[in-house]
Every structure is written in C-alpha cells, then in structure tokens.
Amino acid sequence: MPGLTPPVNYEQVYKVLAIGFLLCASIYCLRSNHLPHVGDNIHSLPHGGNYADGTKRVQYFRPHSSTSTNHKYTALCAVLTLSLLIFAQTRLAAGNRITSVSICHHCSSQGSLSGGNHGRVSGHSELPTT
C-alpha cells in the first residue's frame, strides 16, 4: 500500500550533528582566553610583563593562586570519569538482565514448529520433557 512506508530514521544525522557540536564547543573552550585583560588597546600583557612609556608604566605579573589547577586537565578528567561511570553502569546493567529459555513442555521433543528448534536449546542436545 502506498503511503504506509516507515518514517525516515534520522538517528545517524542527529549523532553526527551532536558530535560536531561537541567537537566545536570543546575546541572553543580549549582555545579561548580566560585571562584578565591587562594593558590598553595597543599594549597587551596577558601573561605578565613590564612596559614603560614616556608617561605610563605597566607592571603585571603572571596570575597565580595558592591552588594552581589547570582547567583543561580538570575537564579532561571529568569527561574520562563520566565516560567510565557510564561504561560501568551499562556493564552492570547488562549483568543484571535475566535471560531465560522458554521450553514448551506440551509439544513433542522433535519440534512441531517450523525450524525444528522448538523445545531445544541451540548447541545442546534435546532437553528432557516432563
């Protein structure tokens, strides 16, 4: 029947767009400058330094704190930790699944359905019926 076709699956397109967006956001965050602006429109000393002109003098030293952390490595550790937690959660969830084989005890052990595997487990001999 025309008109009863399944809808187009855009899952792969959304995955590619999400990966591209995350890649662009990651590159932007890693390359953006978050240091305070020091100097004027002509002279910039973002990493510290000295500048002396006829009427002005600028001394700016490298910003530091008692707890020096590199935020790039902090973000990397957060991403790796979250990835590890998600992976562990999926592995634990897969281990908790209950899988069972249903065997019809009312049918003959020869298998009355097409395929001949009704009442048998693949790779094993026939199971006794009660």
Swiss-Prot record:
The keyword Transmembrane helix applies. The keyword Membrane applies. The chain crosses the membrane at residues 13-30, 73-90. InterPro entries: Plant_vir_prot (IPR001896). It comes from the Viruses. Residues 31-72 are lumenal. One of its GO terms (cellular component) is host cell endoplasmic reticulum membrane. Residues 1-12, 91-130 are cytoplasmic. Its main location: host cell. Plays a role in viral cell-to-cell propagation, by facilitating genome transport to neighboring plant cells through plasmosdesmata,. Belongs to the Tymovirales TGBp2 protein family. TGBp1, TGBp2 and TGBp3 seem to act together for cell-to-cell propagation. TGBp1 is the main movement protein that physically cross the plasmodesma with the viral genome. TGBp2 and TGBp3 would facilitate TGBp1 function. This is Movement protein TGB2. It comes from Narcissus mosaic virus (NMV).
